[in-house]
Amino acid sequence: HLLKMLSLMLDGDKRVSSEQPGEQSKRPVEILLPKVEDEILRADLKKATAIPARSLLFNIDQKFDGIGGTHEAPILEVFMKVPNELQGYYGNQGYVAQFEHDLNKRGQFEAFKQTYERVNGRSWDNDRDALATVTKRSFAKAYAEQFGGSEDDAIKVINDAKDSYRLSIEGFASRVKEYLASQPPGFRLNFFVDEAGQFIGQERSRLLNLQTVVESLASATDGRATVFITSQADLEGILGQVKFEQADDLSKIQ
């Protein structure tokens, strides 16, 4: 439960309802501090929790379930899905999330969603999971209504978005940096990843992918995005009889 406790403590928006009638909800740290006797630990807790931050807690194996695509870099796919969902984009299809993000950057996303619901009688959020199949024509109607052009032109837009979408570690790090830039000064984004060891298994490529994600994220955000990882099983045990270079890879993450 340590990972969950840390995620709650470090998230500036998290509140715990009081069991006492009439009392306002409190931050988890406000409940914990009166029970901490060590003054140094108390000071460290106050300092850490005073930093504005958002916690993203997820089980990596569960979060991976449902993602579409080639799965050439499954670790990266999950890490990209999480901030997409945080911002209200569709996490299971990267090209749809990228399309939504691009509209949002131009200040057109909310207007498009309103047009979609008015034209089709259904919400965009409920329909977008079937965009590649049954709702493509519904998308075309709404897109043509909002931006002009024909419905065939609209279908070409979303097809081109799918064909041109490429997921990269640099793109992911850039998106996180962009999100942080929209937040108050000093704001941090913390990824709390549960069961990473089980998901990595004996696949060295996943281990290296995780290492690169962590390093790129820290570099792009000047340390304002941090990755916390837990595993019920020891990572060395999961990897089995690793070769020397694999053990070296592992040490870079630990």
Predicted feature residues:
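Short secondary-structure boundary/capping segments
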Residues: L3-G12, E72-F79, S205-Q211, D234-I253
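Substrate-engagement module of ASCE P-loop NTPases
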Residues: G12, R175-S182, N209-T226, D249-I253
